[in-house]
Each structure stands twice: as structure tokens, then as C-alpha cells.
């Protein structure tokens, strides 16, 4: 398949999952947005829908979320070198049991050495051949009470590369990078072009916010409404051809 920025140019943009999460017969009609933005209207029409979650979502009824049309989930696992999301293991197993393709993500903390963060991720996220590749969440966190600072572009890239290598070694799968427009512009623009990206863009399509970046996943709202989840949740879409989703789950993003 040939994909553009919304349907990225790559055959490798889809995901290995031995336990196939089912067909796309459960469409996204039951998925909604509390505050929809016209700039991301196209995301609502895309067929491969997903979410990203953490302990903030509380208890999740994964079977209901799956039936409503949730095909994949990015699940917060670790942050820095000493924080494990208290709902990670519950969400990790719940998503798998419901047939939702899932990935574990690590939130990068700029005030801790990368090798300590890598070790923490490896200690808490079990390698799973059925899982999607792990995600490295790379963004500034200027509202943090413990680490609001920005470091240099060079130092940020060094930390990112150390984490990516460690996560790939641990899981056997090349990680996905999550970021937002500001961090991409200041640090990632023109870098790491051989990685899949998951991009935040809640008021416009990604190609309008990111210079020269192809994407695999798009986080298009933080005010999503999904059956099985109380309150609001981030919603995402996969950027490839939805007709290939089941085939893709069986073939790509395999262990190296």
C-alpha cells in the first residue's frame, strides 16, 4: 500500500499480534468526543481507532471498549526511574484478554540518567511477542514539580537514543516515538527518520503541525468518550489502510 502523511508511505506501519484483536466489524460509531474540533474531523472517519490510557482512567471495562470499536491501546507503564503506573499490569492483561492490540509506553524524565530509566522499564514491562512495539514518550514537561527544565537538544537526543536502543533490545521490537509539536520542532525535526512516530495534534492534521514527518499513529483529541471508560480519554487513529489491519497484525512489527 502507498500512504501519504495521513496514510503514511510505508508497508511496515502495522502491527504484529499473534492473538488477533478481531475484525473491524465493531466500528467507531460508539466512540465520541466531548469537545470535537473541526481541524481533526478526518480522524473520526478513519477506521482503525485506538486510545491511550494510564491510572487516570481508573478501572477500564476493556471488553466494552473493544466492542465499541477500540482496536489498539497505548498503556502507560513507567516514568523516569522509579514510577510504575499503578494500573499498568491490570490494563496490560485486560486489554490483551479483550483482544485489544496494546503497547507499553515510558514517559521520559529529563532529570534522570537514561540508563536508569531503561533499567526501570525493563524491570517492569515483560517482553511479550504478542504486544505492539513499545513507545518512548518524548516531550517537555515544564509543569513538572520536580523536573520542569529543558535540556539541550544534543543531550535530549542522547537520552532518547539510549532509551530507544534499550527498549528495542528488551522487547525485540523497534520502538515507536510519541511527541508533540513543540518538542518535535525543538529537538526531533529531521532526526530519527527510520522510526515510526505517534504524533499529538488536536487542532489540525499532523502534516499541518510537523515539518517533514511521516506518521503511523495520530493522537487527535484528549476529550474522547469511549464506552467502558469513565470520564475522558485520549483517542488515536492508525494512519494506514484500514483494509490491511488484520493482515498487518499478523505480519509486521515482528520481533527482530
Show which residues each predicted segment covers.
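Bacterial N-terminal signal peptides that target proteins for export
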Residues: 2-9
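Bacterial N-terminal signal peptides
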Residues: 11-19
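Bacterial signal peptide processing site
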Residues: 21-24
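A short, Lys/Arg-enriched amphipathic alpha-helix followed by its capping loop at the start of a domain
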Residues: 64-70
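Catalytic domains of cell-wall/extracellular-matrix polysaccharide-remodeling enzymes
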Residues: 133-211
Amino acid at each position: 500500500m502507498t500512504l501519504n502523511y495521513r496514510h503514511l508511505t510505508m508497508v511496515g506501519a502495522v502491527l504484529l499480534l499473534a492473538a488477533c484483536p478481531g475484525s473491524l466489524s465493531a466500528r467507531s460509531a460508539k466512540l465520541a468526543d466531548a469537545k470535537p474540533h473541526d481541524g481533526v474531523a478526518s480522524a473520526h472517519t478513519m477506521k482503525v481507532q485506538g486510545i491511550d490510557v494510564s491510572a487516570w482512567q481508573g478501572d477500564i471495562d476493556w471488553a466494552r471498549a473493544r466492542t465499541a470499536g477500540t482496536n489498539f491501546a497505548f498503556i502507560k507503564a513507567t516514568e523516569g526511574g522509579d514510577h510504575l503506573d499503578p494500573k499498568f499490569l491490570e490494563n496490560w492483561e485486560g486489554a490483551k484478554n479483550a483482544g485489544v492490540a496494546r503497547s507499553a509506553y515510558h514517559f521520559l524524565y529529563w532529570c534522570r540518567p537514561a540508563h536508569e530509566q531503561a533499567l526501570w522499564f525493563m524491570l517492569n514491562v515483560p517482553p511479550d511477542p504478542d504486544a505492539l512495539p513499545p513507545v518512548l514518550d518524548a516531550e517537555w514537561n515544564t509543569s513538572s514539580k520536580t523536573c520542569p527544565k529543558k535540556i539541550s537538544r544534543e543531550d535530549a537526543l542522547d537520552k532518547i537514543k539510549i532509551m530507544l536502543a534499550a527498549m528495542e533490545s528488551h522487547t525485540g521490537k523497534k520502538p515507536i516515538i510519541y511527541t508533540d509539536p513543540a518538542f518535535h520542532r525543538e529537538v526531533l525535526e529531521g532526526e530519527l527518520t527510520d522510526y515510526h512516530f505517534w504524533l499529538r495534534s488536536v487542532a489540525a492534521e499532523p502534516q499541518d503541525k510537523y515539518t517533514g514527518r511521516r506518521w503511523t499513529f495520530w493522537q487527535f483529541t484528549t476529550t474522547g468518550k469511549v464506552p467502558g471508560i469513565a470520564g475522558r480519554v485520549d483517542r488515536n487513529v492508525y494512519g494506514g489502510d484500514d483494509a490491511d489491519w488484520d493482515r498487518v497484525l499478523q505480519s509486521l512489527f515482528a520481533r527482530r
